[in-house]
A protein has these predicted regions:
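Basic helix-extension-helix modules of the SAP/HeH family
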Residues: 1-123
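Alpha-helix boundary/N-cap detector
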Residues: 7, 15, 19, 39, ...
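Short, charged/polar micro-motifs that form catalytic or ligand-binding hotspots
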Residues: 14, 61, 77-84, 132, ...
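DNA-recognition alpha helix
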Residues: 28-29, 160-169
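Short, amphipathic alpha-helical interaction segments positioned at domain boundaries
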Residues: 57-59, 115-152, 211-241
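The feature captures two recurrent sequence modes
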Residues: 66-73, 77, 141, 145-160
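Charge-enriched amphipathic alpha-helical scaffolds
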Residues: 89-99, 169-198, 285-289
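Long, charge-rich, low-complexity intrinsically disordered regions
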Residues: 200-286
Length: 290
């Protein structure tokens, strides 16, 4: 990872000044900010600017491990600097809710992340406790496993998602807590969209499309192709799924496809055949073994 000089003096007022009332309300909803809905635009802008620093700790609790690691790096490099990493191209809750700013460096094929000086001290105050909290380990592992599954399949219905993520022996959690954790990463910006579909017996089924699946969106648009992807669930080993889930974190730590191949072999005991079957391009996070 590299750093460079950047303008980190921008404020939340700068970020929200050009937004509509509905856009600010959407951000407040995503971050679970306690802001009254019946406010005028100027009043809402003032309220959200004060609410974000005050409730940033609650928001950070919902983030994936690699997002917290990215924030940690942005805090450590200090004021006036940006962090440059190989392009992630993800719909991170950090970006979607304007906690960090991102610029795509086309010539360097990298993303340039900046964190406002206004938010840095608030994040620095609560981030270490979250990163080092032993009680977060089940949640972090659940998130990692979920990233792996959605990288491989693209769409999950709620029941299958629960079965695949929690009740497969990966994590020993009681059902209510498992459902709570599942909802936490659904609401965290991890999923790009949620839609309800009516199946033949008249019951409604929820499908969640991963934010990491940009290159598979054309495939997911076709019902038959999506069913085929989900049907392939049993074709993948736990190691493959976990490796896919670990990929966003790996991209922050290393640069280059060959290094990634070595990591897959060493850390996840993937065979040469499995590694060769890994399809990767710079526009996506994660690999899709299709």
């Amino acid at each position: 990872m590299q750093t460079r000089q950047a303008n980190t003096a921008y404020t939340l007022a700068d970020v929200f000044r050009g937004m509509t009332l509905s856009e600010m309300q959407a951000t407040a909803y995503d971050m679970s900010l306690p802001i009254p809905s019946k406010l005028r635009k100027a009043e809402y802008q003032e309220a959200i600017i004060h609410a974000i620093p005050e409730h940033i700790g609650d928001f950070l609790l919902r983030l994936a491990r690699y997002e917290l690691e990215l924030l940690d790096q942005l805090v450590l490099i200090g004021s006036g600097k940006a962090l440059i990493v190989p392009t992630l191209s993800i719909n991170s809750a950090l970006i979607a809710n304007h906690i960090i700013q991102v610029e795509f460096l086309r010539n360097e094929h990298a993303d340039c992340f900046t964190l406002s000086d206004e938010l840095r001290p608030h994040i620095a105050q609560c981030l270490p406790a979250i990163l080092n909290d032993p009680d977060r380990k089940p949640f972090d592992r659940l998130m990692q496993y979920a990233f792996g599954i959605t990288n491989l399949y693209g769409a999950l219905d709620y029941k299958k998602g629960m079965d695949m993520i929690v009740f497969r022996g990966m994590i020993d959690l009681d059902k209510p807590k498992a459902r709570l954790l599942f909802k936490r990463f659904i609401n965290s910006g991890f999923f790009l969209q949620c839609s309800q579909e009516t199946i033949q017996n008249g019951k409604e089924n929820q499908y969640f499309t991963s934010a990491l699946m940009y290159e598979l969106e054309p495939v997911l648009a076709e019902t038959k192709a999506r069913k085929k992807l989900v049907k392939r669930y049993n074709d993948f080993s736990d190691e493959e799924i976990l490796a896919a889930g670990e990929f966003p974190y790996i991209r922050l730590m290393c640069d280059g496809y060959e290094e990634l191949r070595k990591l897959l072999r060493a850390e996840f005991r993937m065979s040469d055949e499995q590694v060769r079957g890994t399809r990767y391009d710079s526009k996506s996070v994660g690999f899709i073994a299709i």
